[in-house]
Amino acid sequence: MGPRKKSVKTCIMNNEIPEEMTADETKDYMNQLSHEVLCHIFRYLPLQDIMCMECLSRKLKEAVTLYLRVVRVVDLCAGRWWEYMPSGFTDASFLTLLKKMPDVEQLYGLHPRYLERRRVRGHEAFSIPGVLEALQACPNLVGVETSHLELVESIWTYMPHVHILGKFRNRNGAFPIPPENKLKIPIGAKIQTLHLVGVNVPEIPCIPMLRHLYMKWVRLTKPQPFKDFLCISLRTFVMRNCAGPTNSLKYVPLVTGLASARNLEHLEMVRVPFLGGLIQHVVEDSWRSGGFRNLHTIVLGACKNALEVDLGYLIITAARRLHEVRIQPSLTKDGVFSALKMAELEFPQFETLHLGYVDEFLLQSRMANADLVKYGLADVVENPGIITDIGMKAVNEVFSCIKYLAIYNCPHLHNPYNWISDHSRWTRLVDINLVRCHALKLDSFGQFIELLPSLEFISLDQMFREPPKGCARVGLSAGTGIGVSSALVSNQNSNNDDNNAQNNNANIHDNNHHHPDDSDEENDFRQDLQPGEQQFAADALNEMEDIVQEDGEVVAESGNNTPAHSQAIIPVDVDEEQAGPSGLQRVVKPTSITVHDSESDDEEDSLELQEVWIPKNGTRRYSEREEKTGESVQSRELSVSGKGKTPLRKRYNSHQMGQSKQFPLEESSCEKGCQVTSEQIKADMKAARDIPEKKKNKDVYPSCSSTTASTVGNSSSHNTASQSPDFVRTVNSGGSSEPSPTEVDVSRQCACSPGGSEDSEAMEEGDAESSVCPRCCCHRPQESQRRTSRCSDEERPSTSRACVVNGPDGTRSAFSFRTLPQGGSSGPAHDERTNGSGSGATGEDRRGSSQPESCDVQSNEDYPRRPLTRARSRLSHVLLVSESEVAKTKPRHAMKRKRTADKSTSTSDPVIEDDHVQVLVLKSKNLVGVTMTNCGITDLVLKDCPKMMFIHATRCRVLKHLKVENAPIVNRFDYAQCKKLNMDQVLDQILRMPPERNRIIYLRPMQQVDTLTLEQKLFSGPYPYHICIIHEFSNPPNVRNKVRIRSWMDTIANINQELIKYEFFPEATRSEEDLKKYPKYPWGREIYTLEGVVDGAPYSMISDFPWLRSLRAAEPNSFARYDFEDDEESTIYAPRRKGQLSADICMETIGEEISEMRQMKKGVFQRVVAIFIHYCDVNGEPVEDDYI
């Protein structure tokens, strides 16, 4: 206090300061308050702030001393129980503090960050003995709240009368269980809530006061840890993944002790190997006295020996108050619900059912079962649930009031539509969550959703996976139950349950289980709520137990009688898992062949193409849409040139003298790009037989050797040797008789065929006069002599290059096949592969003068076009090479290309196949939102969803399109890491919706985005909204701008609505006349750009939102709130910092601008749309993000 008094005297003596200011500064209002008022104020302040006031003045020091003398409840963490107490305490200072509080009874927040185990002489520290000494200095102390294991054990030992307040939860839990985390619980410990995570505990004794016991990753070290277990006041018992005794008999005292807790409400046992049938017998003995009668939550997960009767007895006993049941996969069976159905019970409060429940730790942990057993956990081998559609029908007949349904990995569920019956209407179901039920049929699911009257939320995870590529081509169904493969992959062989169980435990679930026996449905099982009649239920459950045992025998017998063909299928090398309609499936690869992903190889080829053929001033053209399979063009005689069953292939160098006349070509539409006909297979066999005969009449260079090329898998008629649609042809079109020695391997053959083998053979076989290659569309001269190619199989010219042709003038010209959008079509356009010439209709599709013209190749006719599938959308950025540019480049040999095969095909075919179209049609009058994660759906259709509000799609690889027929109020769209999403189509669908709501669209694309084209389409389109496009470049992702935009986009719309409705402000329109009136930038809008940096990452916003710039630049008003963390430096616009809390307040701020726009007669839209694009995934690699 000395320095303060000294400074005051100095100020008084200073003649430059006015006297009235000195008087105001010296006046101390706090000292005018009484001690009683100050003590009353201290009740609302944290203890740390109270202690700081002690040094401000003498009166405040007296008030603090008086307050501490009478205080009875002290919180060292100011109510924040999750934080640590203030640092800086030592044993002496903590003792001094508590001595000032002689009447303290309850001490909360004793959470020291670190405590020494013992004192060290001469060293000031904060230690356990020092804390105990300070606590013992408080004579009236009743309870202490702490989270320190050693401290609470010391309190129990030296101060047993002190209660442990609140919830004891240790903060250093981990798995594997740290050996230093130890706690010995004494008998009769005074504690009500005990949460232990990652602790070594000898035993759980008798604790009469204990109400809530939560044990996770707890190692019970004594051989009989539950010998004295008795907690009669227990309400919650949770035991998850604990390392206890392996002998099931040692859990008998645990279950009997739980039965003695008459008020037990929550029972959760995960990986507890109690004795099978134990719960049944304990319930039989205790239900009359109230054992397990008050349960409202039952959770059984990975309990090795649990039987259906154990679960059934618990459910029946607790029927009156039961709210939630989570059932482990081994108990997820039809028989359980058939027996409960026959009990004829009512569950008036039941709401939540989780089938196939697997604990999160087992799902997220990468440890195998052997690793968990090594750390002391029970040895559990978990199989997927085997409940069928019959059991699901019984579910709702038993639990008629169910609201929340979650199903995990039940591979025997097929038709949800069959879950509905006269007695099973699912009338109260609000939320359905399906995970990895891979056999569920999409159309049946859509019909099921339509019949649910109260459904509001749908969550789909790893559902409706796309079938592997190539299955439709060879007639396989890949687990869908349709076609030839159903006999090979159906659920008939259960002789490898061990493998299935291990994979299921490691979050890799297979579909190798036997269907349950239907005899469970015939149990005559009746149950009433009267105590005297419940013996009938016990007898019925005994019968159910016998039937279940018989079922087990049947399954075992079927496993031993597995057909021989199923056992003969032995994988050579399990490489990795691929997601198909049957969940995650193993892909079997022969060890002698390296199989590469077709898409990745095509990307490599396109990169190689750019390195070889891109000139310095080469331009690039972007295709607008690549959606549907184009038309496949084949010649009439060459329709069987494709190969279906891997014929023998020999490579020749086709060369012919003179020129030949052209043969007309016809186009045939190809619905599926990989279908094989019997005619093609016969042609393959015939071509293979004819090759050796024709070889006899050919002149071969002496130095050349004829090699036979073996191919990987099968190829289709237009995909025989090419996967990329943008491919190189090197042809001698001049008609010279002899090739130059340096170009004999490259320029004398059509590169679309491997050495000119099959197509050359088929060409001469069909029509010797035709000189048009059926695939690359290059004219090749007919040859009287054929020479085998010098190049080996590995040196085969790549077929993914730009076409290079020797022109008549000797120069090397080039053309590349391009994807050209159909002009003027707003819907899905059919993309066509055409040549690069600037003549005909092809030239009309080119925009501007940025595209160089390519040369004509011997004639102006249209060349055959290969189909472009939606799966090829990543090859849309392809350059066009002009004649003059290629003339400057030096001739080079084609790059080496690896053999390609799509590793996601079941037959390892080197084919390009379109994604299997799967359309999810939603029609529900109460549906609010749908969330999809890792689903194989390609199209989402909102047919009739009047209450739908949001759509979330994350990591849906093949999701491409959205169609909105009737969903007027849907306003939030979230598409994150959807690899093949057609952004243009989705945005067009959303913006064409009637402007009844403001809408926000969040996109995280995984491909490059042409921002200029996107902005042009949105701002120039017929969309009656004010539009805002935000480009966010933070990596890792920052959600600050995304979250904050929702707080102010509605404010802009509210201002517009106020002006239009009450101020007679003109409303803007976006009709066809308006589009014709404003054909150029800014298309009748006031477009501006805002840029900035948030948390070190730049953002850019392009918008025509009115009023926003003025509101951002305005000064804060009297309503400004500074308790909000954001300002313009950390987000785009912070209205609360400005005090702009409502539309009325904002209109006062921008009144001048409103008058100007009224005079200019510029209208505004009532609704706004915000499009938020996050660019952290555009390189194709998904960024880890906790927010999705």
Swiss-Prot record:
Enumerate composition-biased segments (Basic residues).
889-900
Q: Which domain of life is it from?
A: Eukaryota
Q: Where is motif Nuclear localization signal found?
A: 896-899
Q: Where is this motif: Nuclear export signal 3?
A: 451-460
Q: What induces it?
A: Up-regulated by IL2. Down-regulated in tumor-infiltrating T-cells.
Could you tell me which InterPro entries the record lists for this protein?
Answer: F-box-like_dom_sf (IPR036047), F-box_dom (IPR001810), FBX38 (IPR042354), LRR_dom_sf (IPR032675)
Supply the SUPFAM superfamilies for this chain.
Answer: F-box domain, RNI-like
Q: Where is this motif: Nuclear export signal 1?
A: 194-201
UniProt function note: Substrate recognition component of a SCF (SKP1-CUL1-F-box protein) E3 ubiquitin-protein ligase complex which mediates the ubiquitination and subsequent proteasomal degradation of PDCD1/PD-1, thereby regulating T-cells-mediated immunity. Required for anti-tumor activity of T-cells by promoting the degradation of PDCD1/PD-1; the PDCD1-mediated inhibitory pathway being exploited by tumors to attenuate anti-tumor immunity and facilitate tumor survival. May indirectly stimulate the activity of transcription factor KLF7, a regulator of neuronal differentiation, without promoting KLF7 ubiquitination.
Q: Where is the composition biased (Low complexity)?
A: 491-509
Composition bias type Polar residues, residue spans: 703-740, 849-861
GO biological process terms, alphabetically, are: adaptive immune response; positive regulation of neuron projection development; positive regulation of T cell activation; positive regulation of T cell mediated immune response to tumor cell; protein K48-linked ubiquitination; SCF-dependent proteasomal ubiquitin-dependent protein catabolic process
GO cellular component labels = cytoplasm; cytosol; nucleus; SCF ubiquitin ligase complex
* Entry-linked Pfam families: F-box
The protein's name is F-box only protein 38
